[in-house]
Amino acid sequence: MKCVVFTGGGTGGHIFPGLAVAEALSSSLECRIVWIGSAKGVDRKIVESSELYSASPSVLEFIGIPAGKLRRYFSFQNFIDVFKVAAGFIKSFFILLKLKPVFVFSKGGFVSVPPCAAAKFLKIPVITHECDFSPGLATRINSKFANRILVSYQETAELLPASLRSKVICTGNPVRLSFYSGRPEKGRSFLNIKSNLPVLFVLGGSLGARQLNDLISDSIEYLVKHFVVVHQIGEANMDQGQKIKEGLLKSSPEFAENYKPYPFIKKEMADVLSLSSIVVSRAGANTVWESAAAGKPMILVPLEKGSSRGDQIENAEFFKKKGSAEILLGEDVRPDIFIRLLRDLGFEENISGNERLKNMAQASAALAGEKPALVIADFLKSFFTSKNEDL
C-alpha cells in the first residue's frame, strides 16, 4: 500500500481541514496516511480522536516530532527553538526516508516546516494549503519548497511573491463532508429543543472567546425572548455559562430553557449548524467555512490585530463582501449594536420570508459549494499516476 504524509498542527485550525482532506482521499483511494505533528501539545489528541482514526486506525497513523515556534518578533526563546526546528528536520528526514511517501501535504503551523523542508531535500513532492485570506509565516516558508500552493481565496495569490504565483491553485477551504448534509431534526433532538423560535448558534471555539461570551452574557435577556441560544462557550468558561443560566432562572424563568451552554460540540456540530438560523462567531477560517458549507448567515466578531496578525479581520471582510456575513469589530462589539443588527436582519419578524437572510444563506452556500475537501483529494490523487514535474 502506498503511503502519503500529512503535516500541520499547533492548533486544531491547522489539523481539522487536513483531516477532512484525509477522509476524502481515503474514501476513494487505498493508501496509508501518516500525520507528522508536534510531539507535544494537542496534535496527537486531535488526530487520534478523529472519525478516520476511530474507523480505520490502520489507515491513519500519527508520528510526533520536536517543534520550535516561528516568531515574527525578537525573543530569546527563538535561540532555543532553532535547535528544536533542526531536530524536527532531522527526525522528519529519516521518517520520510523510511516511508517514501508519494507526497507531503501541509496544512501549516510551525510544525509543518521541517517535514516540508526534508521532503524538498529528498525530492518528494510538497503541496501546501493556506486556510486564511493572507498566508501565515509557515505557509510563506513552505511555499518555497512546494510543487503546488493551494489557497482558499483567489486573492491570496497576490499576497505571495510573483515568482510563486504560477504554483497557486484556488480550492477553497476543506471541511468535513458531513457539514454539507447536516440533519436539523437530529440537531433538535440532541439539543432537546421544543420551541419554534429561531436558533442562534454562538461559536466561541473549543477554548471559548471571552469577548464573544461577554457579548452574549450582556445581551441574554433580549436573546432568550427571541431565540434559542446554543452557546459553545468553551470548557474553561462553563462556569460563566452556568452563571448566565442561573441569572435567567431568577430574572426570566419562563425563558431560561432557551439558553443552552455547551463546552464543545463535536460529532453533532453539522446537525446543530443545519438547525441554526444564524451563526455568531469569531472569524477563524475553519468556523466561517464550516458555516458556509451549511449555508448559514453569519455575524462575525473577528479577533483584532492586537490579538492576532489580522487574519480573522481579513476573513470576515471577505465573507461580508460576498454577502454572507455582517461584522462587529472593536467598539461595535456592544449589546445595543448587536441587538440592533439582529433586528435589522428581521429576527423580530417572520424569518421564513426574509429575503435578506435568504440572500446571506445563498451567498454562504455558493462560497463552499464546490466541496474543497473533494477538490483537493482529487488533485492529490493525480500524484499517484503523474510524474512529479508534470504537477
Swiss-Prot record:
Residues reported to bind UDP-N-acetyl-alpha-D-glucosamine: T11, G12, G13, R176, S206, Q312
CDD domains (alphabetical): GT28_MurG
Topological relation to the membrane, as annotated: Peripheral membrane protein
PANTHER family given in the database record: UDP-N-ACETYLGLUCOSAMINE--N-ACETYLMURAMYL-(PENTAPEPTIDE) PYROPHOSPHORYL-UNDECAPRENOL N-ACETYLGLUCOSAMINE TRANSFERASE (PTHR21015:SF27), UDP-N-ACETYLGLUCOSAMINE--N-ACETYLMURAMYL-(PENTAPEPTIDE) PYROPHOSPHORYL-UNDECAPRENOL N-ACETYLGLUCOSAMINE TRANSFERASE 1 (PTHR21015)
One GO MF term attached to the UniProt entry: UDP-N-acetyl-D-glucosamine:N-acetylmuramoyl-L-alanyl-D-glutamyl-meso-2,6-diaminopimelyl-D-alanyl-D-alanine-diphosphoundecaprenol 4-beta-N-acetylglucosaminlytransferase activity
Pathway(s) it belongs to: Cell wall biogenesis; peptidoglycan biosynthesis
Keywords assigned: Cell cycle, Cell division, Cell inner membrane, Cell membrane, Cell shape, Cell wall biogenesis/degradation, Glycosyltransferase, Membrane, Peptidoglycan synthesis, Transferase
Family: Belongs to the glycosyltransferase 28 family. MurG subfamily.
Pfam families referenced in this protein's UniProt entry, alphabetically: Glyco_tran_28_C, Glyco_transf_28
Purpose of the protein: Cell wall formation. Catalyzes the transfer of a GlcNAc subunit on undecaprenyl-pyrophosphoryl-MurNAc-pentapeptide (lipid intermediate I) to form undecaprenyl-pyrophosphoryl-MurNAc-(pentapeptide)GlcNAc (lipid intermediate II).
Reactions the enzyme catalyzes: di-trans,octa-cis-undecaprenyl diphospho-N-acetyl-alpha-D-muramoyl-L-alanyl-D-glutamyl-meso-2,6-diaminopimeloyl-D-alanyl-D-alanine + UDP-N-acetyl-alpha-D-glucosamine = di-trans,octa-cis-undecaprenyl diphospho-[N-acetyl-alpha-D-glucosaminyl-(1->4)]-N-acetyl-alpha-D-muramoyl-L-alanyl-D-glutamyl-meso-2,6-diaminopimeloyl-D-alanyl-D-alanine + UDP + H(+)
InterPro entries: GlcNAc_MurG, Glyco_trans_28_C, GlycoTrans_28_N
Name of the protein described by the UniProt record: UDP-N-acetylglucosamine--N-acetylmuramyl-(pentapeptide) pyrophosphoryl-undecaprenol N-acetylglucosamine transferase
Gene Ontology biological-process entries: carbohydrate metabolic process; cell division; cell wall organization; lipid glycosylation; peptidoglycan biosynthetic process; regulation of cell shape
